[in-house]
Each structure stands twice: as C-alpha cells, then as structure tokens.
Amino acid sequence: MGTGILTMPLYKTLPKADITCLDYSADMMGQAQEKADRLHLKNVTFRQGDVGALPYADGAFDIVLSLNGFHAFPDKEAAYQEIFRVLRPGGTFCGCFYVKGEQKRTDWFVRHVYEKTGFFTPPYETTFSLKKRLEKRYAAVTLGTVKSMVWFVCQKAE
C-alpha cells in the first residue's frame, strides 16, 4: 500500500467500493491514513500486516492491487501464495514492480543503492520468470514492461 500517493486520489472515484489497504510499515500506513482523512474517504480501511501472511479469509477479495511492492518483499513466494489464496475465484490480481534485466543502469542502481539501504530485497523477477510464475497460477495473464518496470493483470480461474 505504501503512502497512498498514487492510490488515495483514485479511491475517491470509487465511493461504492470497499477498499482494504495493508502495509508492513506503520509509518507508510500512517501517511496513507492521513491522505485518506484529507480526502474524506469513508470506504477505505487500513491494517498493518505482512503480505506473506495475510490476515484474511480465503477468497475475501475481488481485486488485489500491488504497486511497487514485490521488489521489496522479503518472502516473495509467500506473498504470491497469499495473494492467490485471498483472491476469489474469477478475481483480478494486478500491479507493477521492478524487474531485473530490462535496464542495465537501473539494475546497477538497485544493486548498489536500493539493496544497501534495504528498500529492495533480492531475488528479483525478470519479465520472463514473472510471466511463467503467473501463468502457473492464473487462467489469464497480460503483462508488459516500461523500462525496468513490469505491469500485469491476472484473472483467477472461476
């Protein structure tokens, strides 16, 4: 969920949706909550937690959105499994994150700066490895890249 800088304004356009935001960082969650309060969002709830051990029932969500998270998650496989578990049959998993191998300069920066600060944690997906991983779980997968970022939309089988 992060600070909500990209999502909170979007959520204002979805007044009938029930939106649940989860982040491991209390600081990030606090910043997102402040943005939601300033926008008077009444349909958004916040919960601190670990994407690798989601505190929700199987099939609890119609849509799971993950923006710029997977390159930072410490246990990526657990995150993929948990997201699949909490997504209802026919639900949509979408998002974006850094993938290695698309931009040498970005790869260098990730290794020498972001990893050292703890913002990114290896191992990283490549576009090819992500496509294979998602196609094993989901009935339909669409993905593309913009420089070193991959975006994807996946549909879980009914």
Question: Would you name each region that the model predicts?
Answer:
Residues M1-A53:
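Class I SAM-dependent methyltransferase SAM/SAH-binding core
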Residues L14-P15, P74, R88, E135:
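Short conserved AdoMet
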Residues T20, R47, L65-S66, C94:
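Conserved Rossmann-like nucleotide-binding pocket used by diverse enzymes
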Residues I63-D75:
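A short SAM/SAH-binding and catalytic strip from SAM-dependent methyltransferases
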Residues E77-P89:
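A short glycine-rich, Lys/Arg-flanked "PGG" loop and its adjoining helix->strand segment in the class I
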Residues C94-F152:
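C-terminal alpha-helical "lid/dimerization" subdomain adjacent to the S-adenosyl-L-methionine
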Residues F152-E158:
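C-terminal lobe and adjacent flexible extensions of AdoMet/dcAdoMet transferase-like proteins
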